[in-house]
């Protein structure tokens, strides 16, 4: 950055939000695509760097892609193809043979990086997200004794829709090379098993959620992703009252102004335009709120090279301009659009300073912003308005749920949120905070690790071996959006215990029992 030297910028995406605290606790190696302008300047001779810079706790291994590879693998097949295929948001997927070939090539390259990072021939490999559907098969071919856990962070489509992809069989066979395939919800698991039943020589046991195929056995489970708890960003932030004052001062608002917040990537799945229409209806139906209520939409620029994303950006800009022109005055704007990257500390300041948070996803695997809002409110105040089409709605029962396509319903829920008594706010927030605290990121990772350990110990799968056979384990976390890690679990256990709010959680049991996690590798796209 001009005049500032090298600056560390952390992604606000859900995958990084979930994985980064686990990496800090496990002291691992994260294999990731390097996209920052200074990434090559900071790596060592093995394309690695220790992070975070101030207090390094894990290693980041970079994989480099050129422009055509980035366009074909990431922008093309992964996002124009798979992202659109897996989300019901009105955008048709685009599939090109050249994009799939590049996707396969890049998956093979990340898999090779995993093989280079691991020690021994029986690692535990955790592969993350839709960017790496083929990687489990490539890793299996190179490390046949490995235990592979693939986690798919976004929704899995229904079988008929999946078959629109010309390479749907290759995707399924790639994932079925895993010992365990994880999803956000049980609905996703059902859709995946329905899809697998279309493959020859695959037998699905619905009672156990197990697929048997070509001598292999793959377990299919739901592991709802979550946040670290206690939340480091909350402990490092100002008190809630100070955050309220700070954000209103920054926005030039009077202290009594009611404030709503939305935090999204500029993505067509996030329902930002529908959200703005609901706010417009709210101001129509409640004239008394004009001048007394402001909604801040943090909109992270995303995939700007794709037409669908440019279109949604223009729709958001036009809606904001129209609503502000209709209800605004010389000193008042009902909508404040902040179209830029915000560091996590900035986001949490707004979450802690707002009266309500509106998550209006049209289709979302989980949506961690909803959980971040809950995590941020240690004052047990604030109201979460949450789309029923986000996976988080299945866990956060204290939220006011909406169908974002029903504008009138959404406006009514927003009015209810603004009028909710403090005691009801506290009751709802307390119940949601209990869920997020108990089922946190360490619980999420720990369950996957524990299930993998149990699979190996029991020898239940012909494509895994019992963990007890070796004292040195390797954890490969995530081929897709982030990278791999090397973890030593004797040290990792103590670190995890320090960061957890509960004592006997799955990651601790896994570490104490079946694992001594040594140098895990987590392949991902970019942290």
Label each region the model flagged:
Residues 487-510:
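Asp-based phosphoryl-transfer active-site loop
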Residues 510-526:
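Short, acidic loop-to-helix structural element flanking the phosphoryl-transfer center
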Residues 461-463, 487, 525:
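Intrinsically disordered/low-complexity terminal segments and short unstructured peptides
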Residues 5-9, 509-514:
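Short, N-terminal intrinsically disordered low-complexity segments that are rich in Pro/Gly
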Residues 159, 394, 505-507, 512:
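Conserved protein kinase catalytic core
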Residues 478-486:
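Short, basic/aromatic recognition patches
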Residues 1-473:
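Catalytic cores of carbohydrate-active enzymes across secretory and cytosolic contexts
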């Amino acid at each position: 950055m001009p005049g500032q030297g090298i600056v560390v910028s952390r992604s606000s995406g859900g995958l990084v939000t979930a994985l980064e605290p686990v990496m800090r606790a496990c002291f691992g190696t994260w294999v990731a695509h390097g996209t920052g302008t200074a990434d090559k300047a900071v790596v060592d001779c093995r394309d690695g760097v220790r992070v975070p810079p101030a207090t390094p706790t894990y290693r980041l291994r970079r994989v480099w892609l050129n422009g055509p590879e980035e366009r074909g693998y990431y922008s093309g097949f992964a996002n124009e193809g798979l992202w659109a295929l897996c989300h019901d948001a009105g955008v048709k997927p685009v599939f090109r043979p050249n994009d799939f070939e590049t996707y396969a090539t890049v998956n093979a390259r990340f898999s090779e990086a995993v093989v280079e990072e691991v020690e021994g021939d029986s690692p535990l490999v955790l592969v993350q997200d839709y960017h790496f559907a083929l990687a489990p098969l490539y890793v299996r071919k190179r490390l046949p004794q490995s235990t592979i856990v693939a986690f798919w962070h976004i929704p899995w489509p229904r079988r008929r829709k999946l078959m629109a992809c010309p390479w749907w069989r290759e995707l399924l066979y790639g994932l079925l090379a895993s010992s365990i395939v994880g999803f956000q919800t049980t609905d996703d698991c059902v859709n995946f098993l329905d899809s697998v039943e279309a493959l020859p020589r695959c037998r699905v046991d619905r009672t156990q959620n197990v697929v048997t195929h070509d001598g292999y056995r793959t377990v299919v489970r739901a592991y709802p992703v979550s946040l670290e708890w206690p939340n480091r960003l909350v402990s490092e932030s100002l008190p809630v009252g100070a955050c309220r004052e700070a954000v209103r001062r920054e926005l030039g608002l009077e202290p009594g102004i009611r404030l709503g917040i939305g935090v999204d990537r500029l993505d067509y799945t996030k329902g930002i335009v529908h959200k703005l229409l609901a706010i417009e209806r709210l101001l129509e139906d409640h004239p008394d709120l004009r001048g007394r209520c402001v909604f801040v939409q943090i909109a992270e620029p995303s995939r700007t090279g794709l037409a669908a994303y440019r279109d949604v950006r223009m729709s958001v800009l036009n809606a904001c301009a129209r609503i502000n022109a209709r209800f605004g005055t010389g000193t008042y704007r009902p909508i404040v659009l902040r179209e830029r990257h915000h560091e996590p500390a900035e986001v949490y300041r707004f979450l802690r300073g707002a009266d309500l948070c509106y998550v209006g996803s049209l289709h979302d695997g989980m949506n961690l912003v909803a959980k971040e809002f809950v995590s941020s409110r240690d004052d047990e105040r604030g109201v979460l308005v949450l789309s029923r089409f986000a996976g988080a709605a299945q866990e956060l029962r204290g939220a006011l749920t909406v169908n974002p396509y029903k504008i009138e319903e959404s406006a009514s829920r927003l009015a209810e949120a603004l009028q909710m008594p403090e005691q009801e706010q506290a009751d709802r927030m307390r119940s949601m905070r209990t869920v997020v605290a108990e089922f946190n990121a360490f619980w999420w990772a720990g369950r996957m690790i524990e299930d993998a350990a149990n699979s190996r110990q029991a020898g239940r799968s012909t494509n895994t071996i019992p963990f007890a056979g070796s004292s040195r384990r390797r954890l490969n976390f995530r081929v897709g959006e982030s990278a791999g890690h090397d973890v030593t679990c004797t040290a990792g256990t103590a670190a995890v215990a320090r960061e957890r709010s509960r004592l006997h959680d799955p990651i601790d049991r896994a570490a104490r029992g079946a694992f001594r996690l040594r140098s895990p590798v987590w392949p991902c796209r970019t942290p």
